[in-house]
Amino acid sequence: MANILKSGKLPAPARIIEEAIVGPSLGKESISAGMFSFIFALIVVLIYVALYYSGAGLAANIALLVNIFFIFGVLASIGAVLTLPGIAGIILTIGMSIDANVLIYERIREEMKNGKGLKLAVTDGYNSAYSSIIDANVTTLLTAIILYTFGTGPIKGFATTLVIGILTSLFAAIFITRLIISARLDKGKTISFATKMTQRAFQNINIDFIGKRKRYYILSSVVIILGIGSLITKGLNFGVDFVGGRTYVVRFDDAVDNEAVRSALSAVFVDENGKSSTAQVKTFGPDNQVKITTSFMIQSKDITTDKVVESKLAEGLATTGLEYEIMSSQKVGATIADDIKDAALWSVIFSLIVIFLYILVRFRKWQFSLGAIVSLAHDVLIVLSVFSIFYGILPFSLEIDQAFIAAILTIIGYSINDTVVVFDRMREYLNNNKKKGLHATANDALNSTLSRTFNTSLTTFVVLLIIFISGGEVIKGFMFALMVGVVVGTYSSLFIASTITLDTTKKED
């Protein structure tokens, strides 16, 4: 296209400043790995939900299958291209879509525990859960929309499936599951919301989360200080999205020595002025596959530069004496890298501002907003710290790229989802018993939502773990960030958000 435009009458020639190419072999492998992960994760979630919630779990499973059908139907109707990040978005939706049903079922179980009949418990359970479901999903939806607005390419695909998944999940949980349960009850039949193994799970739990908050402050502070130290001394492994350059994933027909490849490429990556550019070579998956990163001639504006670089790359790789195939390549110009970096920073900042304002409007107290934002900043810092500390240690890529920013925004959405559920219960308890202190109310809210927190976090983490293991090398770093985020987000919703809210409230209401 650049050549076509150059041959026309434009006053300035066009050149490609950002490009991503995926070879047919890698594309086929990625989609196969993604679909396998999708089916495996779906089966695991279906079994777990049925084992935990019995008959009601089967109703939730039917709704989940309908939800997936809706997602694929909407994607097909808008002509969306199914990419690996898009598949990851669908798989993540599987884990998160269970959350609405878990919220509803736990409220129904509470109503039944308080002595209500099954029909009344179902009605009141749904009515009580609506507020938490809407608030939790709106905050996640807002971050997904921001991700779509600031993201490019595959990241938009991930955000698109996430937005569609959130909306269809709400419909499936609120309408389809209730339709199935109500139809059964109207026929005079009963339905169980627990099995013998799970009917007493998380009952009579009374953990003093608030009383031990100083321990959690110290623990989080130590981890963050270590992380900041690593960020200062070691830094982060920025990908070409943020610094500009070229990357190639190359597969050889036999194991290859990374240092030999690096030396060979450094010897040929010399421009017309005699300036040499180094190449970074790392094993990418199996020992016969490497990822090559270089800034060689990335500043050049000559339209023939790409062909020159490809020729030099072929010359260097030929010295290995092995047959090879370029599985994928990516090029990001320095100007585009700066734009991506700015967009990434603003997307995170804008997400935090929007969430602060939404929590302020919904809960009418700035202390709730502050508690939420501090916990989110805590989550982001710890994920960054983990990527800095373990960069070069773990046997897979921990690059900071657009996918990582997508992971950070997803973590923000997931974590605030968790936090809002607790805040909503705190608000409910404060309205029902205004004489009870905030300390006791916060503990009651955390303990009463512990079952929901456990089930949602476990299903989401298991889904992510399955993708991490079987989804292929391309998506490992992205999934690792999400896995760390789920663990840290769950921790902060239990031990940071509510305690910050409590400590910044001058008096108990």
Region locations from a protein language model:
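A structural signal for conserved, well-ordered secondary-structure elements
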Residues: 1-509
